[in-house]
Amino acid sequence: MIGRLRGILLEKQPPEVLIEVNGIGYEVQMPMSCFYELPNIGEEAIIYTHFVVREDAQLLYGFNTVKERALFREVIKANGVGPKLGLGILSGMTASQFVSCVEREDVSTLVKLPGVGKKTAERLVVEMKDRLKGWGAGDLFTPFTDAAPTDSAAASSNSAEEEAVSALLALGYKPTQASKVVSQIAKPDMSSEQLIREALKSMV
């Protein structure tokens, strides 16, 4: 079981990062709410991981705090919710926002998340409301900021849009939906991370 990685960020391709630890590169998929808070490429990062073994793959899901990882593990315990859907859920909103939605039984907001229909949203509320009692939000979770991306190197407008669409597809959004929302919000000076952030905000 791989539970924590501390190393140098080599690549950031939303929603995946490549982090080098003692000469070994680990590919880690992260919710966008955590991805935004990562340091620059070439800098040290600490990622708390959840390890998934399938017949065809071994996957790592990463988080900035132990609490965020714990919430992810609670989410994927819900009937019909796997790691990919859990990643999409915690990309569409922050951990604290999700906890708040469950506590308030806000099904109408949950159904806006990728892959979450009404039945799944209702199931999340029913199955998780008691389990999340007392969690609270505050400083336990990574804040969802509007700060500019940390990487100094900005991609061109077209490649940023393509990268944003690819990230949304990886999170479970449909191709037509992803392309439409990115084209609507895209501006020449926006990075892929800014595009993804604004796209996710507009769809929730």
From Swiss-Prot:
It holds the Pfam family RuvA_N. One of its GO terms (molecular function) is four-way junction DNA binding. Gene3D superfamilies: 5' to 3' exonuclease, C-terminal subdomain, DNA helicase RuvA subunit, C-terminal domain, Nucleic acid-binding proteins. Transmembrane segments: none annotated. The keyword DNA damage applies. Belongs to the RuvA family. This is Holliday junction branch migration complex subunit RuvA. It comes from Vibrio parahaemolyticus serotype O3:K6 (strain RIMD 2210633). The lineage of its organism: Bacteria, Pseudomonadati, Pseudomonadota, Gammaproteobacteria, Vibrionales. The gene is ruvA.
